[in-house]
Structure formats: structure tokens, C-alpha cells
Regions:
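DNA replication initiation on ssDNA origins
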Residues: 1-79
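Beta-strand-rich binding-surface signature
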Residues: 80, 104, 118
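Residues in well-ordered beta-strands of folded domains
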Residues: 84, 111, 122
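Short amphipathic alpha-helix segments
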Residues: 88-106
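Short beta-strand
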Residues: 109-115, 150-151
Length: 151
């Protein structure tokens, strides 16, 4: 089953959504559709400047189709939760954790975040928006990682 997700031009543009199959979005990430900007983000040492650069990336809402970029504008849940794992001290640790996560039966996809210092992990869940937070909390317990971003 192909899930449809929502993209916005960037984090500031929240009114004009684009809807695409998740596999198309993942393929574009894999192919490096924004690789030049990602390289600039990863090279930038100043956190404020890096955050400004990140505002130029497309904003992806993996959890479903939305009319706008807020929870109340959910049209249909995709059956996907995007988890963030952050705070890795060393690149080797990040890569090792990514490899381990991809072996987990719940993980649909895992990739290095645009900053290069974290991971984005997609997990399939029932497409039930009423239980989205419950699934998130259960996944936090399942992965039991100090790098799991609880926000």
C-alpha cells in the first residue's frame, strides 16, 4: 500500500501543500534532490546560520495529507510516523545506529537528517490519527534510545 504524504515548499510556506507518494519522496531524498543546500547546511558551523539555511528545505509531513501545516488540517493519516534521533557525538555512532534501526521490523525507512547530526526514521503504524500520540509513545519505549527526540 502506498501512503501519500504532504510537502510544503519550505518551513515558512504553510498554505500550499503538495501531495506525493511516500516512496517518490524517499527516492528524491536518496537521489539528493536538495543535496547542494544540504551540503551547505552540513558545512555551516554556526547554529543560527545553519537553522536559517534549513528553512530553505522542503517541509515534509510524513504523517499524512494536510491542507495546511498544522495538526487540525489533517485530511488523511498516512500510516507513517517520522521519528527523530539526535545528539550523536560521533558520525560512526550515528551510522551504526542507522544500520541497526534499518534491521528493526517496524522501520520502513531511515536516513541521515539534513544537519548530518541525526536520523529521520519512518515507522508504519495504523492510519488512526486518534492514536497517533499513543503510537509515538509506544515507539519511544520500543526504541529505548537516549537519542530519541521526544518532542
Amino acid at each position: 500500500m502506498t501512503s501519500t504524504v504532504t510537502l510544503f515548499r519550505n518551513i515558512v510556506e504553510t498554505a500550499t501543500p503538495f501531495h506525493r507518494p511516500v516512496d517518490v519522496v524517499l527516492q528524491r531524498i536518496k537521489e539528493g534532490a536538495t543535496k547542494d543546500l544540504v551540503k551547505r547546511i552540513r558545512a555551516e558551523r554556526n547554529k543560527t546560520a545553519r537553522n536559517e539555511l534549513k528553512k530553505g528545505l522542503p517541509a515534509i509531513c510524513f504523517s499524512g495529507t494536510f491542507n495546511k501545516r498544522n495538526d487540525k488540517s489533517l485530511v488523511q493519516h498516512s500510516g507513517i510516523i517520522c521519528l527523530d534521533f539526535d545528539g550523536y557525538e560521533k558520525k560512526k555512532e550515528l551510522i551504526s545506529h542507522k544500520e541497526n534501526l534499518t534491521k528493526d521490523p517496524y522501520v520502513y525507512s531511515a536516513f541521515v537528517s539534513p544537519s548530518g547530526n541525526g536520523l529521520k526514521v519512518l515507522v508504519r503504524v495504523p492510519a488512526d490519527p486518534d492514536n497517533h500520540v499513543n503510537y509515538f509513545n509506544a515507539l519511544q519505549k520500543h526504541f529505548d534510545s537516549p537519542h530519541f527526540d521526544k518532542t
